[in-house]
């Protein structure tokens, strides 16, 4: 409290020292009649007189040193510029743009929910070993953790929050640091997030001599940083509520420039966006914003405008909003079931920002304790053979997100993902559509896979094969058409419900021409909607990180021409690389015999021996199976794949035969997969032992039926003609 009094009393000069190196004179500085006077006293006291007569305060430095370290006092003294002339101080801050009496007061939703203190029977310490025994088998997360321990790990690094010459007092705090440089340094952002507030410094470099700069601060109204000179936070306050406040520090010249090019027209909307949503809500809003950046090509070519600035400030504010969970004088126990979903949504948002803006740098917001605790929870989860998960799907995937592959030697994470995908895929193959709930679950699966570091032993196991057989199968021609329609409509989008399995498949044959063909089949779309949808899907599917799925395959080092690859079908022992030219070592088959417009080959690659193989010099013909009988008794084709492709359009859809029901539905007389009315569509059967066939039996039967009908028609016409000739002959004989 004494420290706060000290700062408030000294105001512009913030004099805080046990005994200045030289006693300050009591004579007012030249040209100033009301300068604060510093009266020399004993070495343990400092007397400040504000008007020379009536108002003075005596500060006991001995008592202050009990609460404030000596080096901090000295730093504040040096930062206050006590001995510089008032003219210098005035000139230093005279150009600051002031919003005196213009701060907008808003009413927020009230105090948003934070994780309340709990008293769990099992509390986990991050400073000790964490195992399945430590958590007493509570894989549902019914555990307590220390808010201080988690906060100390997330906000671990200590840094100076503001530049030395900034109008805010320099202060060192535990922070999360974030920076982004764009256009070769023409645009620079540096953000610091603490548990009390967040600051964002924005720099626009026009030339070597012309630079514009602004500092935005948002946070707890009572804990905002102090200011130097004659400036107060009331001079630079834009928006405030009972609990929080938004400040903008910039010069008049820079304010004029940024108001035209960068600053939002309505700062109240920015304030409300951050303050009126919980961590989870704000994180999901920002996730959708990042997807919008990606679909519009704004990740590769950033538009440095008000929308971008608002989004970036809100992303930084997520750190601060998470930090409020850990601010308390006394250590308290919080529920893991409450805090983990918040951490998950926030971290997913941060990951998406990093993937969008690849030059983004962040330091901090990592918790080894959460990672180890999540691994212990995963290890305790019971998995029954051929059964689904024993815990809620979202909880499993949120927990798995924080588990490194090195902490999951039994591959329970990948096993669980296959169970989830098996369930979704079973519903999908009925009519080749996905529900919004299924898409959200796939989004969670995607995040768990993206952040997971695979052990080398997991790269060729059956779970990886199953995962990508499922996801690639769900990336069908119908799915591509759905995505084009979804993004073509100017409606409210959602990162969770707009997710497509194509974003985590092993299919890479996307071109603007192909997407236009798929989208053109939807007669409901206008030309503008078609163009918007195709552009969005193409941007999302061809992002820089779109080929990340190949990283988990054991044959990745053996693919020597990735740009040729159209699709990969992974099985446990072999993989099929479908490409426009030979792209991997193995046995290669030519698909050109089926009159495909563009060349396409299929290479059968051994997962374990591809390092020792060379590219095939001989390209074989694909064997053909005529009149293939429908499998009836058992699942003869389980763990095989059927692929359809068009002579003009190329690959269309892949179907993984996961069980007997899928097999029977696929080959039934009512199957919607086989198009009996299109003579230009062909089908390949790829088996898990490296054997492949082209299925032509359906076409042979269909062609024979047509020929028979034609023969009967010709015979009937010939009979009619003969009868006609006989009648005419008898009539005129």
UniProtKB/Swiss-Prot annotation:
Residues 15-707 are virion surface. Its main location: virion. This is Envelope glycoprotein H. InterPro entries: Herpes_gH, Herpes_glycoH_C, Herpes_glycoH_C_sf. One of its GO terms (biological process) is fusion of virus membrane with host plasma membrane. Interacts with glycoprotein L (gL); this interaction is necessary for the correct processing and cell surface expression of gH. The heterodimer gH/gL seems to interact with gB trimers during fusion. Residues 729-733 are intravirion. Residues 185-249 are annotated as: Interaction with gL. It comes from Alcelaphine herpesvirus 1 (strain C500) (AlHV-1). The chain crosses the membrane at residues 708-728. Keywords: Fusion of virus membrane with host cell membrane, Fusion of virus membrane with host membrane, Glycoprotein, Host cell membrane, Host endosome, Host membrane, Membrane, Sialic acid, Signal, Transmembrane, Transmembrane helix, Viral envelope protein, Viral penetration into host cytoplasm, Virion, Virus entry into host cell. N-glycosylated, O-glycosylated, and sialylated. Glycans are attached at residues 78, 119, 266, 431, 561, 573, 612, 627, 689. It is a single-pass type I membrane protein.
């Amino acid at each position: 409290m004494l420290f706060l009094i000290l700062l408030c009393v000294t105001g512009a000069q913030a004099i805080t020292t046990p005994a200045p190196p030289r006693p300050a004179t009591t004579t007012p500085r030249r040209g100033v009649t009301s300068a604060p006077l510093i009266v020399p006293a004993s070495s343990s006291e400092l007397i400040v007189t504000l008007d020379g007569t009536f108002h003075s305060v005596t500060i006991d430095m001995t008592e202050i040193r009990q609460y404030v370290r000596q080096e901090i006092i000295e730093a504040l003294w040096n930062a206050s510029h006590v001995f510089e002339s008032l003219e210098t101080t005035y000139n230093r801050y005279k150009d600051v743009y002031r919003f005196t009496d213009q701060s907008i007061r808003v009413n927020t939703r009230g105090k948003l929910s934070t994780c309340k203190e709990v008293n769990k029977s099992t509390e986990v310490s991050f400073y000790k070993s964490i195992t399945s025994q430590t958590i007493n088998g509570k894989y549902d997360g019914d555990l307590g953790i220390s808010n201080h321990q988690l906060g100390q790990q997330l906000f671990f690094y200590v840094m100076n929050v503001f530049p030395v010459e900034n109008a805010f007092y320099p202060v060192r705090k535990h922070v999360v640091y974030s920076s982004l440089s764009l256009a070769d340094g023409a645009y620079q952002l540096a953000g610091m997030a603490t548990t009390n507030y967040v600051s964002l410094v924005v720099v626009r470099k026009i030339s070597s001599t012309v630079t514009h700069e602004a500092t935005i601060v948002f946070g707890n109204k009572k804990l905002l940083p102090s200011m130097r000179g004659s400036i107060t936070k009331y001079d630079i306050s834009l928006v405030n509520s009972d609990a929080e406040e938004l400040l903008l520090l910039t010069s008049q010249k820079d304010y004029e420039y940024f108001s035209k090019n960068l600053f939002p027209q309505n700062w109240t909307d920015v304030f409300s966006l951050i303050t009126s949503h919980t961590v989870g809500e704000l994180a999901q809003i920002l996730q959708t914003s990042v997807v919008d950046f990606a679909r519009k090509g704004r990740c590769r070519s950033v538009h440095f405008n008000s929308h971008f600035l608002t989004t970036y400030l809100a992303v930084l504010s997520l750190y601060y909003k998470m930090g409020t969970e850990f601010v308390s004088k006394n250590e308290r126990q919080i529920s893991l079931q409450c805090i983990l979903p918040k951490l998950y949504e926030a971290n997913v948002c941060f990951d998406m920002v990093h993937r969008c803006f690849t030059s983004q740098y962040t330091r901090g917001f990592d918790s080894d304790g959460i990672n180890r605790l999540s691994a212990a929870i995963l290890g305790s989860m019971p998995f029954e053979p051929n059964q689904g998960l024993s815990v809620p799907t979202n909880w499993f995937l949120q927990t798995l997100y924080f588990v490194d592959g090195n902490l999951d030697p039994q591959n329970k994470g990948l096993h669980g993902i296959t169970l989830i995908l098996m369930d979704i895929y079973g519903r999908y193959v009925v009519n080749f559509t996905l529900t919004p709930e299924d898409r959200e679950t796939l989004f969670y699966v995607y995040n768990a896979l993206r952040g997971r570091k695979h052990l080398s032993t997991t790269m060729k196991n059956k779970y990886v094969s199953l995962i990508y057989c499922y996801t690639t199968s769900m990336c069908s021609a119908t799915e591509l058409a759905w995505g084009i329609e979804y993004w073509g409509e100017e409606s409210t989008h959602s990162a969770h419900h707009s997710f497509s399995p194509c974003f985590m498949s092993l299919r890479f044959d996307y071109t603007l021409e192909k997407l236009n063909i798929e989208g053109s089949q939807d007669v409901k779309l206008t030309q503008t909607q078609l163009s918007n949808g195709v552009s969005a899907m193409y941007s999302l599917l061809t992002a820089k990180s779109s080929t990340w799925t190949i990283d988990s395959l054991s044959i990745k080092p053996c693919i020597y021409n990735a740009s040729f690859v159209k699709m990969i079908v992974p099985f446990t022992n072999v993989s099929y690389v479908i490409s426009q030219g030979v792209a991997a070592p193995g046995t290669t088959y030519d698909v050109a015999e089926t009159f495909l417009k563009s060349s396409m080959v299929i290479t059968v690659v051994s997962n374990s021996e591809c390092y020792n193989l060379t590219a095939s010099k001989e390209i074989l013909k694909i064997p053909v199976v005529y009149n293939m009988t429908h499998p009836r008794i058992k699942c003869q084709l389980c763990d095989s794949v059927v692929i359809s492709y068009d002579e003009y359009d190329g690959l269309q859809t892949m179907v993984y035969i996961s069980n007997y029901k899928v097999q029977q539905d696929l080959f039934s007389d009512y199957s919607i997969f086989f198009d009996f009315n299109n003579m230009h569509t062909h089908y390949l059967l790829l088996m898990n032992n490296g054997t492949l066939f082209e299925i032509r039996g359906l076409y042979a039967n269909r062609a024979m039926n047509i020929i028979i009908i034609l023969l009967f028609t010709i015979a009937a016409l010939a009979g009619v003609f003969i009868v006609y000739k006989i009648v005419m002959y008898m009539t005129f004989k």
